[in-house]
Amino acid sequence: MEKIIVRGGNKLHGSVKVEGAKNAVLPVIAASILAERGASIIEEVPSLTDVYTMKEVLANLNVGVEYENGRFAVRADRPLKTEAPFEYVRKMRASFLVMGPLLARVGRARIALPGGCAIGSRPIEQHLKGFEAMGATVEIGNGFIEARIDGKLQGTKIYLDFPSVGATENIMMAAVLAEGTTIIENVAEEPEIVDLANYLNAMGAKVRGAGTGVIRIDGVDALQGAVHSVIPDRIEAGTFMVAAAITGGNVFVEGAIAEHMRPLVAKMREMGVDIIEEEAGLRVIGPEQLKAVDIKTMPHPGFPTDMQAQMMALLLRAEGTSVVTETVFENRFMHVEEFRRMNGNIKIEGRSAIVSGPTSLQGAEVGATDLRAGAALVLAGLVADGYTRVTELKHLDRGYVNLTEKLKALGADIERVEEHQENESLEAAELI
């Protein structure tokens, strides 16, 4: 079993390049199924376990896939299989995103009930509601969801009860080949939605309104392969921004797009962090003393839930009391117990966490309960007294490429080791 060992105390300096966005690339890969002719070339694809899982899902559907050096090539101009089995889908909820494209392209999809991070209920009813509104028959049983349509899906008006990112993406992909016009209201407005719409339009789709609360899609007869470069990962960028701020460092985050991160930039500036917007990215300079702020996660353009845990690590170092309210997922405070193991002073009251700081964090052995919690614990380790050991790295590898190496290049005292190598690593560190 691997673990990350961090010794706190070093300020981070230098430059770090952000990878392509995990939450953008997965739906884009799924959308490639829609192309009846030609190859799709997707660039800036991060080397993540979720990407490899999606590659396996597509290969199992008889889609031709190649992935090398950040470039993903897809050919779906062949007879497609229609079942995504549990062995793949259980690893990652985003596998469910192939349902919309399969339903639109071949009229049938049988997908195992999805897996992924255990951070509360993320119901798929919104996806299915959209498919049914477009004329599909949906059945759930024996661990599978099966959707069928005789003929083509029909354009219609769909209202989402909640602006779910996954439901917005899945319904968008189904609607591009539907007969007539589909209008989706109360949709997600994330930058990743805009990125998917740009890719679909490059394939020949007619999608308008992405990035607003209403998306209008005029169905077309067929799509073809296209070339697309994935947007930078705003959550990875945000994680490195917090790393710079929490250590009092000075880091240039190459590829960070301020327009995609306005809530985070605003809150960090409110805490006293100096953030300079440059043409190629953002420079982040941490202050001597951070100020407490309140944070409430919301669908975009509100504060992103995927940055809640990392910001909580930063708030532990701030002067005063901060309140973090989680409104998107009902079970996303599992990292609080791990912070407490590091001497974090946090109380839970319903959907809010009350953070009292500044806390003198202490190194401890902690577990990554989910993807973003893992990153947050590494961030806390950067300023903790002594050694912090972060385990359960399988979650971390789903969303970060070479996190340890990138932090080390910025000056962090950090190693990723096998359990049997830990003593050797610590002994070597003591000699330096």
Swiss-Prot record:
EC number of the protein: 2.5.1.7
Pathway it works in: Cell wall biogenesis; peptidoglycan biosynthesis
Any matching Pfam family: EPSP_synthase
Binding site for UDP-N-acetyl-alpha-D-glucosamine: R93, R122, P123, I124, E125, Q126, D306, V328
Active site (record annotation): C117 (proton donor)
Binding site for phosphoenolpyruvate: K22, N23
Modified residues (2-(S-cysteinyl)pyruvic acid O-phosphothioketal): C117
The keyword Transmembrane helix belongs to this UniProt entry's keyword annotation: no
Family according to the record: Belongs to the EPSP synthase family. MurA subfamily.
Keyword Transferase: yes
Major localization listed first in the record, in broad terms: cytoplasm
GO molecular function: UDP-N-acetylglucosamine 1-carboxyvinyltransferase activity
Protein name (record): UDP-N-acetylglucosamine 1-carboxyvinyltransferase 1
Listed GO CC annotations: cytoplasm
A Gene Ontology biological process term: UDP-N-acetylgalactosamine biosynthetic process
Keyword terms, alphabetized: Cell cycle, Cell division, Cell shape, Cell wall biogenesis/degradation, Cytoplasm, Peptidoglycan synthesis, Pyruvate, Transferase
Free-text function comment from the UniProt entry: Cell wall formation. Adds enolpyruvyl to UDP-N-acetylglucosamine.
Catalyzed reactions: phosphoenolpyruvate + UDP-N-acetyl-alpha-D-glucosamine = UDP-N-acetyl-3-O-(1-carboxyvinyl)-alpha-D-glucosamine + phosphate
PANTHER family the record matches: UDP-N-ACETYLGLUCOSAMINE 1-CARBOXYVINYLTRANSFERASE
Localization in the cell: Cytoplasm
Gene that encodes the chain: murA1
